Amino acid sequence: EDVKKDVGPKPVFSGYSEFYADIDKGQKILCFFVPGCEHCRDAARDLNALQKKYKDFPQVQIVFMDEESEKIPDFFKYAGKQFPYKVIDVIPFWTKLGSGKDTPGVVYLHNGNLIKFYDGIAEKAFNSKALEKVIYK
């Protein structure tokens, strides 16, 4: 553990602990991906690149929509790394992603606090350079 590291904001419950029990501890990245989605694959590959660049990059955890789940091995092959993942049904997936939001969903949490929520492929789309600036400002 790096002692001088910012302990971050006061811990809160993000509402995502049903997927990962430790999601509200420290810095975490939770992704809402669809196995066959090209933009999701690109986002995963970008996150892998950031993890290679920074030893202390937040842990990345994925929630996949249960659609074309046979494509998950190919998804990780493309990303260059297998991240921890859960597969959930279509309706709960969209409910958790949130109303009006689209995939890929990339959520940056610090002690459960929502710091950044990227979604879709338009102006709120995931951008690894922007995330890098948010984490390593």
Language-model regions, residue ranges each:
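Short, internal strand/loop/helix patches
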Residues: 78-105
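Structural motif
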Residues: 32-36, 64-67, 119-120
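N-terminal "domain-start" segment that seeds a small globular fold
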Residues: 1-21
